[in-house]
Amino acid sequence: MKTLVWQSLSDSQQDTVLQRPAITEGANITAAVTSVINTVKQEGDAGVFALTEKFDGVKPDSIRVSNAEIEAASDRLSEEMKTALKQAYSNISKFHQAQKPQPVKVETQPGVICEQITMPINKVGLYIPGGSAPLPSTVLMLGIPAQIAGCHKVVLCSPPPIADEILYVAKLCKIDEVYNIGGAQAVAAMAYGTESVSKVDKIFGPGNAYVTEAKRQVSNDFRGAAIDMPAGPSEVLVIADESADPDFIAADLLSQAEHGPDSQVVLVTPSPIIADQVADAVERQLKELSREDIARQALGSSLLIVADSLTQCVSISNFYGPEHLIVQTKNPRELLPLLDNAGSIFLGDYSPESAGDYASGTNHVLPTYGYTRTYSSLGLADFSKRMTVQELTADGLKGLAPTVVTMAEAEGLDAHKRAVTIRIEKLAQLDVNKQEVNQ
């Protein structure tokens, strides 16, 4: 890891240092994904079967995982694993239950009632990657808010064979449909539907470059599906002072670096001593990792930054806007009001990022690659939609009419104006009729 003294860098050098590597999808990936999507759209289940055999080397008897298979997977799982997953489920559920919005109803002026109501997205799709290790934590992070939000149908796709842990969590989250489909073909199947796979309104979940590109393409097609957020490499930034434990910091940096060679890890500290100690601790701990080669590649583009104060550390962090932000200082909560841009913040020596990744209760699906400036961590709101309601009485419209008419005239929208005045004229005539009856 490079050690840099912040004050020794020019403004342009500081900007360059904190720039992330460009994410580029080759034309070959774009073309390949377009071909996969078209195959699924045109051939449905048959196309999915063919693509699964081509890319996964598997010919499943059925695309859909049966309830019997899910129960069998649950039976095979150890009690230790079930207990861990249930504890994580409980904590994540508690945090997301607390996010339920309250209805809004306001009388903005006499006779004018405005409301905001929240409804679940009708159908959602969850993509869970395959790979060398199962990711039941991702099922929890996606399945629980979908369940609490009340989405009417939840579809899960994962490359075959689907791990027992994933199927068990799908059962915990009461996911409606589980399919043996991976890659871009899974995204296409959920976005457009097939004979077996239900079309969904929004797709959630991480994946490789092909999955990411497929999500981008279907989200740009009005016939496709919305997606959760832009994707990017995993990253962590640690703010630490002289009170921090360098071994803890090193472990936190490495826990992010082992995700992949494109992961970004950054330490910002006012203490040169801590920077040196962390560099030594990283090297020691690296040798103990099964994914040492991957972590070492990530560390090659990562940074140790020595700032002149904690205030400057905060400024650097806010400019960078990390996915994960760990604050290991003497009084970490004092810095919290100063922190503007981060996906998830971990305060204090005993709040490792791993806790949030798995079981503290917060969601581990987070904006990365600088998107923390405009995107938030995944939550209940992402599985919901807001609708506004307004109801005006006759007197309410009378009171509001002059404002609406004046603004419609200013914008040259005669029909907008007429929609109000025709009602006011009708009300005036009714008033005249009432007066005549009463005379």
Swiss-Prot record:
Binding site for Zn(2+): Q256, H259, D357, H416
Reported cofactor(s): Zn(2+)
Catalyzed reactions: L-histidinol + 2 NAD(+) + H2O = L-histidine + 2 NADH + 3 H(+)
Pathway membership: Amino-acid biosynthesis; L-histidine biosynthesis; L-histidine from 5-phospho-alpha-D-ribose 1-diphosphate: step 9/9
EC annotation from Swiss-Prot or TrEMBL: 1.1.1.23
Record's protein name: Histidinol dehydrogenase
UniProt xrefs under CDD domains: Histidinol_dh
GO molecular function, one term: histidinol dehydrogenase activity
Cofactor detail note: Binds 1 zinc ion per subunit.
Function description: Catalyzes the sequential NAD-dependent oxidations of L-histidinol to L-histidinaldehyde and then to L-histidine.
Annotated substrate binding sites: S234, Q256, H259, H324, D357, E411, H416
Gene designation per UniProt: hisD
